[in-house]
Amino acid sequence: YYMDCAGKAVEYMAEGNEIWCHGQMNQHNILYTNGQWQIVNFEHILYAPAIIDVSEFIRKISEKNQWDYRMGERLLNKYESGCPMSEQARKQLLGVLLFPEKFWKIADHYYGSNKAWIPKRDIEKLGKIIAQERERITFIEKVFAISI
């Protein structure tokens, strides 16, 4: 299942316009000080498709809010009110959000650890990811008006 999601994600991301991206765009790196918004912590800057930072932000916020698709629609509408997305960019965003990033991260952590057993904490994290999967897919289907 996760391999299929990853394959679809790669297809959607294939044609990307690349720019310098923050690389770790989340709520912790956006500050409001002296009446202005500031973006901080550029340690993970990378040259990548432009949609990477938007997708990272939407993913992080959505995970923290149980993949509430109404909030996802509001985030996307707000973003597009200042920076309209092409159909290609929307497909790229879909691809990034469809990619099973959390599952992949935990599996990679286990694989790289060279342990003969799966740590209890990793099993707990996998259980949480699997429990949220239906909400994540519903979020994607409703925000992008597709069926997976």
Q: Where on the chain are the PLM-derived regions?
A:
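Helix N-cap / loop-to-helix initiation motif
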Residues: 85-89
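Active-site acidic catalytic loop and adjacent metal/ATP-binding pocket
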Residues: 10-52
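Active-site catalytic-loop/activation-segment of kinase and kinase-like phosphoryl-transfer enzymes
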Residues: 1-11
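Gram-positive cell-envelope targeting signals
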Residues: 2, 37-39, 58
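Active-site activation/catalytic loop segments of kinase-like enzymes and analogous catalytic loops
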Residues: 51-84, 97-115
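ATP/Mg2+ or Mg2+-diphosphate-binding catalytic cores
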Residues: 104-148
